[in-house]
Amino acid sequence: MAFMSMERSTWAFTFGILGNLISLMVFLSPLPTFYRVYRKKSTEGFQSTPYVVTLFSCMLWMYYAFVKSGAELLVTINGVGCVIETVYLAMYLAYAPKSARMLTAKMLLGLNIGLFGVIALVTLLLSRGELRVHVLGWICVAVSLSVFAAPLSIIRLVIRTKSVEFMPFSLSFFLVLSAVIWFLYGLLKKDVFVALPNVLGFVFGVAQMALYMAYRSKKPLVASSSSAVVAAGLEIKLPEHVKEVQAVAKGAVAAAPEGRISCGAEVHPIDDVMPSEVVEVKVDDEETNRTDEMAGDGDHAMVRTEQIIKPDMAIVVEV
């Protein structure tokens, strides 16, 4: 009996070490993404939510491992995970636009500081011993299930676009491997809170791998540029202040002395412009300043590029 118990402990330790190594690979998988963010000095529309939630999950599991005896291998991997996710989020906050930085800061304050603080306070004050372990265990299970369910949006995107661009096979493979290893670790340690969420993690990982095999050779659906941007999570913003650009007949150009008309508009003949050419129209500073003084609103005229439809028309920029 003692031999079987020793053998079980040995296997549990072995699977725990393997789980640490594989989970480390999963934590490091976004490195190419953040290297690109660092190189381009832009987050390119990437979302910070997965990293905030992963950091929250690591914090909870590390707290659980401190409370439960004999869970040192959970402390090591989740401690490393906290450090890695913190570095990712620091880079995101450094290069993200202001709106994304504000949203990320709010999530960190609300989830990783606010909610985690409440959980720690309640479990420390209102529970003791095994009760505290069970309360924390079920909380960790709930958070882990939400983390494993997060790829559902990616699965939906793959089915809609027929493209596996957003779901690399290597990440899905390591997620499945990690789920199997940690399930066996929890089984050998008789820790249901570790084993249970990894069952769902295994199911979702296998589903992602099956989708990858199904769609890897299929041609992705062709979408418009705006649809592709929206699918990637980017936001399209138009200029807020654009001066009106109108087309008038060439006769108006001939009637206007020195290329100007009485309403204060500048006229540019475009006889030699082909229909497919693009003309950039600029408003000179002198005319802009004169108009701003008359209007009194402080708006600045902007430059706008227009597609010329007919070669016998002229562009008039109202200033």
From Swiss-Prot:
Question: Taking every annotated instance into account, which residue ranges of this chain make up the domain MtN3/slv?
Answer: 13-99, 135-219
Where does the record place it? Cell membrane
Output the lineage of the source organism: Eukaryota, Viridiplantae, Streptophyta, Embryophyta, Tracheophyta
**In UniProt terms, what function does this protein have?**
Mediates both low-affinity uptake and efflux of sugar across the plasma membrane. Confers blight susceptibility. Confers TAL effector-mediated susceptibility to Xanthomonas oryzae pv. oryzae.
Keywords annotated in UniProt = Cell membrane, Membrane, Repeat, Sugar transport, Transmembrane, Transmembrane helix, Transport
Swiss-Prot/TrEMBL induction comment: By the X.oryzae pv. oryzae (Xoo) transcription activator-like effector (TALe) proteins (artificial TAL effectors).
Gene3D superfamilies recorded: 1.20.1280.290
Extracellular-side stretches of the chain, per the record, are 1-10, 72, 128-134, 189-191
Membrane topology, as annotated, equals: Multi-pass membrane protein
**What's the protein here called?**
Bidirectional sugar transporter SWEET15
Which organism's genome codes for this protein? Oryza sativa subsp. japonica
Major location category of this protein: membrane
Q: Which GO terms describe its biological process?
A: carbohydrate transport
Family the entry assigns: Belongs to the SWEET sugar transporter family.
Q: Name one GO molecular function term.
A: sugar transmembrane transporter activity
Spell out the GO cellular component terms annotated for this protein, sorted alphabetically and separated by semicolons: membrane; plasma membrane
The UniProt entry, under Pfam families, shows: MtN3_slv
> Topological domain, Cytoplasmic: which ranges?
32-50, 94-106, 156-167, 213-319
Q: What InterPro entries does this protein's entry cite?
A: SWEET, SWEET_rpt
Subunit comment? Forms homooligomers and/or heterooligomers.
The membrane spanning regions, by residue number, are 11-31, 51-71, 73-93, 107-127, 135-155, 168-188, 192-212
